[in-house]
Amino acid sequence: MTSKVGEYEDVPEDESRLTEENVSVPEEEVEDEDEEEDDDDDHIYINEETESGREKVLVSHAPQERIVPPLNFCPVERYLYRSGQPSPVNFPFLLNLKLKTIIWLSNEEPQDTLLEFCDTHRINLQFAAINPDAGEDDNPWDGLTEHSIINVLQTIVTQENYPLLVCCGMGRHRTGTVIGCLRRIMGWNLASVSEEYRRFTGSRGGRILVELLIEAFDTNLVKIDKNKAPSWLLTALE
């Protein structure tokens, strides 16, 4: 009787051991799932436009340097850009554009760092004096003259100067004036030109004198050589 009792006593012990083993299996599986989730946390995903639509793309490593565009940066047309004055934090971004020409709209020189950047990377920095006849008492940040606008646009309508960036202190009014006159050459209506100009002027809004200058600008003063003009301009002129 004693041995039988022992046999009956062993049964629940085996069942208990089997139960513990069964419980331990899902715990290991849960740990594996946690490890997989931890691995996913090490990855970086970005949303990217593809031929099949917007997809989530895995990036193995974060960028090693900061890529920061200049203030009010925006593409205008293919290889033509606009912005405020670039600072050193923007230089890695500008290098990716492979710029050949930067047009600076001011009577004053840009920052020394921008001068050094252009010299180091062989970028043609073109000074477009907004008022060549200005005296010492004149405001160097006044609006552009018709003569200076024409000179800038002659550079813009010549493909050999591309990729090209047009910039001023804040990338608002003087840059907006040049781009607005370019849009007139391209055949844009005044409502669309004004809307684009005001998009960059911020909470203060646009300047009525700038819009009047753009409206009154004689587009025939800009001479376009179709053999040297950018393809997007030729398309607009068709």
From Swiss-Prot:
It catalyses: O-phospho-L-tyrosyl-[protein] + H2O = L-tyrosyl-[protein] + phosphate. The modification Phosphoserine is found at residue 24. SUPFAM superfamilies: (Phosphotyrosine protein) phosphatases II. The active site is at residue 168. Keywords: Acetylation, Cytoplasm, Hydrolase, Phosphoprotein, Protein phosphatase, Stress response. It is found in: Cytoplasm. Its EC number is 3.1.3.48. Residues 26-42 have a biased composition (Acidic residues). The modification N-acetylthreonine is found at residue 2. Residues 72-230 form the Tyrosine-protein phosphatase domain. It is an enzyme of class 3 (hydrolase). Residues 1-43 are annotated as: Disordered. One of its GO terms (cellular component) is cytoplasm. GO terms for biological process: cellular response to oxidative stress. One of its GO terms (molecular function) is phosphatase activity. It holds the Pfam family Y_phosphatase2. Putative tyrosine-protein phosphatase required for protection against superoxide stress. Involved in cell-cycle delay in response to linoleic acid hydroperoxide (LoaOOH). Present with 2310 molecules/cell in log phase SD medium. Belongs to the protein-tyrosine phosphatase family. This is Putative tyrosine-protein phosphatase OCA1. It comes from Saccharomyces cerevisiae (strain ATCC 204508 / S288c). The gene is OCA1.
